[in-house]
Amino acid sequence: MELKGKKITVHDMTLRDGMHPKRHLMTLEQMKSVAQGLDAAGVPLIEVTHGDGLGGASVNYGFPAHSDEEYLSTVIPLMKQAKVSALLLPGIGTVDHLQMAHELGVTTIRVATHCTEADVSEQHITAARKLGMDTVGFLMMAHMNSAEGLVKQAKLMEGYGANCVYVTDSAGYLLPDQVKERIAAVRAALKPETELGFHGHHNLAMGVANSIAAVEAGANRIDAAAAGLGAGAGNTPMEVLVAVCERMGIETGVDVWKIQDVAEDLVVPLMDFPIRVDRDALTLGYAGVYGSFLLFAKRAEKKYGIPARDLLVELGRRGMVGGQEDMIEDTALTMARARGIKVAA
């Protein structure tokens, strides 16, 4: 397919998905610095919230350094051209959170559900559309549903009022042909005016290849993060994606040099550890496990003596999905007992 001249919208995840490896502890200064760099580089849409979306601050998901209100009210007034989005997971975020984000100047809301549970998004998508927001349905863990199944779920979200639907590879499990199959099927089923997006992770180092495959199959919104800062082995690295798009003639509107500088000079120094395809992140992609489980599994390894890799494989076998973080500890405890490892009461 000829992609030269095709325009796409790149959507930055550094300040939302990037909160996972930061344990949601990014400072306001760090947020400001990165957001202003992204804005100056020409990134049109920047997501800002707790890693698990609006209202994510909790014992289950982790308490952030600042509230969603503080992060959003700090970043939004500084933006010269970029718009700011927020993620919302029904059951974590509420319509009140949605209203708060709208009042602070968030223009895009992304309502995220597991890829078989679009029906739980109706209230939030409907509310966002009534507020006149750019309203996105976000189908997570898309490898756990067939192309036909994703079509049904995407059409539900479109019917509730979503003007864009995302196929989301939360585990970094999909390969380019699987991305193409899913994106092409959803594209064919949605109204022509409904936009289609893809969100990739780099656990099998396929983030960029999968994103290009998605564009080839009809996606026009693509998620990425500067230096890949995100759950697991990170998101699709923005600076690499932009460079590849430039080579292919795909128009992103992002400056290829400035985004490299944001990644290298602003984001890499923020990292508490290198975001790379290490043994455990690779296991996420191989076993199809939700990306933000990685740090929980590493913590459980220290506590219970079960290698994170073994735990992640078991979580994949059990079909655990986003929102079941509390089950990671339970699974580790069960495995430790089965292996005769003594665990302190």
From Swiss-Prot:
Residues at the active site:
H20 (proton acceptor)
Q: Lyase: is it a keyword of this entry? A: yes
Which CDD domains did the record assign? DRE_TIM_HOA (cd07943)
Into which EC class is this enzyme placed? lyase
Task: Cite the EC number.
Answer: 4.1.3.39
Give one Pfam family: DmpG_comm
- Write down the position(s) of the site called Transition state stabilizer: R16
Cross-referenced PANTHER family, in alphabetical order? 2-ISOPROPYLMALATE SYNTHASE 1, CHLOROPLASTIC-RELATED, HOMOCITRATE SYNTHASE-RELATED
The protein's name is 4-hydroxy-2-oxovalerate aldolase 3
Organism expressing this protein natively: Comamonas testosteroni
Q: Which taxonomic lineage is given here?
A: Bacteria, Pseudomonadati, Pseudomonadota, Betaproteobacteria, Burkholderiales
